[in-house]
Amino acid sequence: MSRFTGPRLKVMRALGIDLPGLSRKTIEARPTPPGQHGAKNTRRKKSDFGVKLQEKQKLRFNYGLSEKQLRRLMVDARKGKSPTGETLLQLLERRLDNVVFRAGFAPTIAAARQLVTHRHVMLNGKSVNIPSIRVRVGDEISLKASSTKLPIVVETLANPPLTRPEWISWAEQSQQAKVAHLPAAEDVPFPVDVQQVVEYYANRL
């Protein structure tokens, strides 16, 4: 399954939650599920499988991943010493495209991914183009001097979509972000029951 490129607000309405990595829009104005009259303005009670699928989809859509990419991260998370769910969330937050987004360089993770793939992003002073790089403590993230003048960057730095998390320190003068410490599960900027995601993949890997 490839990355989603359809209507983002429709996805968030279906999941019943705002996903800041997917879109700056919110479902506040249209909170009902998509469909004729919002399925009579009600949300049917989901089955256990439906709940697990919904929590998994929150992660996949917010971080802009294909099913294959998310499965691969789950495999890696299982190898860690910490609880699988916590490790999965940390791996997601540590992706370079997410860090570029959380640092305030881009309005969404998709936009941050474009900055990376087009080589606007510098990691420890070197140009990189791989969005899935996992940052480590002490890593420094910045943009090329010419890239800081891009309209999307200027606008987002002036009006960031989210408050920068504590695990990312920020140097205003140099416009450089630094990984102060590794992110924790509570640093994920939307509610998700990650244990449901772990259970979803329990018999699928």
From Swiss-Prot:
SUPFAM superfamilies the UniProt entry points to: Alpha-L RNA-binding motif (SSF55174)
Region of interest called Disordered, as start-end residue ranges on this chain: 25-48
GO CC, one annotated term: small ribosomal subunit
Entry GO MF terms: rRNA binding; structural constituent of ribosome
Gene3D superfamilies: Ribosomal Protein S4 Delta 41, Chain A, domain 1, RNA-binding S4 domain
Positions of the S4 RNA-binding domain: 94-157
Transmembrane helix recorded as keyword: no
UniProt keyword Ribosomal protein, yes or no: yes
Pfam families with a match to the protein in the record: Ribosomal_S4, S4
Keywords: Ribonucleoprotein, Ribosomal protein, RNA-binding, rRNA-binding
Any one Gene Ontology BP term: ribosomal small subunit biogenesis
Assembly information from the UniProt record: Part of the 30S ribosomal subunit. Contacts protein S5. The interaction surface between S4 and S5 is involved in control of translational fidelity.
Family: Belongs to the universal ribosomal protein uS4 family.
HAMAP family (alphabetical): Ribosomal_uS4_B
UniProt xrefs under NCBIfam families: PRK05327.1, rpsD_bact
General function of this protein: One of the primary rRNA binding proteins, it binds directly to 16S rRNA where it nucleates assembly of the body of the 30S subunit. With S5 and S12 plays an important role in translational accuracy.
Name assigned to this protein: Small ribosomal subunit protein uS4
